[in-house]
């Protein structure tokens, strides 16, 4: 079952592509967090999605947000993928146990062994402020995400 707006966001501690541990609590009280759940590195739709985030990163930074990508790929896969794609934001490895974080957020597709496509915005208080799941072949509308993030930022001002 997917998470609900208003509930506390489940904590996590995962390695990024630099092998650095990233915890949700690192951002509490400091930044809003945009969790970008995606199925797999290197797939065409995921590559398009990340290209959109890379191109729009300034907008997300001005909205006081940290973008974190999350998939079941290893940190090593994330490292190669981020270098090839020019991704500067953290890509978190929900690798072992496979999909454990995605499971907490209700977006792990156990029958496929991958993370579903979804975006969650966690506000500075650590609560789910916005959440949307997408069909696997759909690239999320980043204007919609940015609009939701602007509302979250305004609500915390």
Where in the sequence are the language-model features?
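Chalcogenol-based redox active-site neighborhoods
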Residues: 1-157
């Amino acid at each position: 079952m997917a998470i609900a707006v208003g509930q506390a966001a489940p904590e996590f501690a995962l390695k990024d592509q630099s092998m650095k541990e990233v915890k949700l609590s690192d951002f509490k009280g400091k930044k809003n967090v945009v969790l970008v759940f995606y199925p797999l590195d290197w797939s065409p739709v995921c590559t398009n999605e990340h290209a959109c985030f890379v191109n729009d990163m300034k907008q997300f930074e001005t909205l006081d947000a940290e973008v974190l990508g999350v998939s079941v790929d290893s940190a090593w896969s994330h490292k190669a993928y981020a270098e090839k794609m020019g991704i500067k934001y953290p890509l978190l490895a929900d690798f072992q146990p496979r999909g454990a974080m995605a499971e907490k957020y209700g977006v792990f597709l156990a029958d496929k062994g991958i993370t579903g496509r979804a975006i969650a915005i966690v506000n500075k208080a650590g609560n789910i402020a916005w959440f949307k799941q997408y069909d696997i072949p759909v690239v999320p509308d980043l204007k919609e995400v940015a609009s939701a993030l602007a509302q979250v930022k305004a609500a915390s001002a």
